[in-house]
Amino acid sequence: MSSNSVVYWGTGRRKTSVARVRLVPGNGTITINGRPGDNYLNYNPAYIAAVKAPLETLGLSTEYDVLVNVHGGGLTGQSGAIKQGAARALCELSADNRKPLKTEGHLSRDPRAKERRKYGLKKARKAPQFSKR
């Protein structure tokens, strides 16, 4: 990465994961926490596809390198956070990118998270075994 190249930033969140995504003009390599993207995501095709989805929606998958710093949660949450962060960075790149990314759902925050445990129950909704007598 040269010192005068333009860098586009985006932050994504999913479950308890937070991803800070940088887009740099390049050849399409994905680096997550200093490791190659497919290696970091355990070569799981669903996770890799989720990370690449915003770039492929706009046809820019070979024009920008994706540099990611992500923490918290597991691979599902992290790949979702990276997807949202990359989409936000692409919106920063050009305002015209917003509409196709929004229609594909890459910009919306997934609100699903682990439900808290309630007192009197074993888990969030699992009650102790009922005994009639």
Swiss-Prot record:
Keyword Transmembrane: no
A single MF term (Gene Ontology): structural constituent of ribosome
Coiled-coil region(s): none
Gene Ontology annotations for the cellular component aspect, listed alphabetically: cytosolic small ribosomal subunit
Region feature (Disordered): 98-133
UniProt key word Ribonucleoprotein: yes
PROSITE patterns the record matches: RIBOSOMAL_S9 (PS00360)
UniProt biased composition (Basic residues): 114-133
SUPFAM superfamilies: Ribosomal protein S5 domain 2-like
GO biological process, one term: translation
Compositional bias per record (Basic and acidic residues), positions renumbered to this chain: 98-113
Name of one Pfam family that matches: Ribosomal_S9
Gene3D superfamilies: 3.30.230.10
Keywords carried by this UniProt record: Ribonucleoprotein, Ribosomal protein
HAMAP family: Ribosomal_uS9_B (MF_00532_B)
NCBIfam families, alphabetized: PRK00132.1 (NF001099)
Family statement: Belongs to the universal ribosomal protein uS9 family.
Name of this chain's protein: Small ribosomal subunit protein uS9
Organism encoding this protein: Synechococcus sp. (strain CC9902)
Organism lineage: Bacteria, Bacillati, Cyanobacteriota, Cyanophyceae, Synechococcales
